[in-house]
Amino acid sequence: MFTGIIEEIGEITAIAESGDGWRLTVRAPKAAADAVHGESIAVSGVCLTVVGSTAETFDADVMKQTLDVAALGAATVGTRVNIEKAMPVGARLGGHIVQGHVDGTGVVLEVRPGAQWSVLRISLPDDLAPLVVDKGSISVDGTSLTVSAVSPSTPSTGSGTQEGSGTQEGSGTLEGSGTRGGHWFEVSLIPETLAATTLGTRVVGDRVNLETDILARHVERLLAFRAAPEGGSR
């Protein structure tokens, strides 16, 4: 389990095909210094298992399913990633409960910089929209954030994904993406988050990993079972 408090920004230094997946080498001196074979490290919100390490790097395997679901599948050598080691028992829970199991991805639709902070608007897949609430918690690229705004429950048009649908203009908005249509949410980033995570360099059109609150996912599942007709397919 993780808490969504990023410990350092790492860099992917090698990608090797391993079966139908990848083996990544990540340079992250703080995490690698005491990395143990078999332990879990979150890489931009994706829980990976350490299979080897040096003083400054660690290796981890990524299965095809993860590459298909997470934004990590588009990573290249040189990609910067958020790093967090698993939370030890008894540690302070500084963010919220993050499992490292990515639910899907969103696209940065808008960046609104302030004097010392920035607001990001991110698209939200339709199936995740009911799980994201104003003032609730969400993990974006492994970073625990508080949702500062959400789209209406019934958006006007469009889908929750805005891939490749426009170009970045000076306003920091994805041109032609129809930010008024489709599901989205906003997060406000304080200076510490901008400096300590990769979110500070995100631009319009970037794809990010999303993990919704585990409590919301459990409630949704329980309600689905309760609503299912007795003896029906579940």
Regions found by a protein language model. Give the residues of each.
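Conserved loop->alpha-helix
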Residues: M1-P155, T161, T173, T179-R234
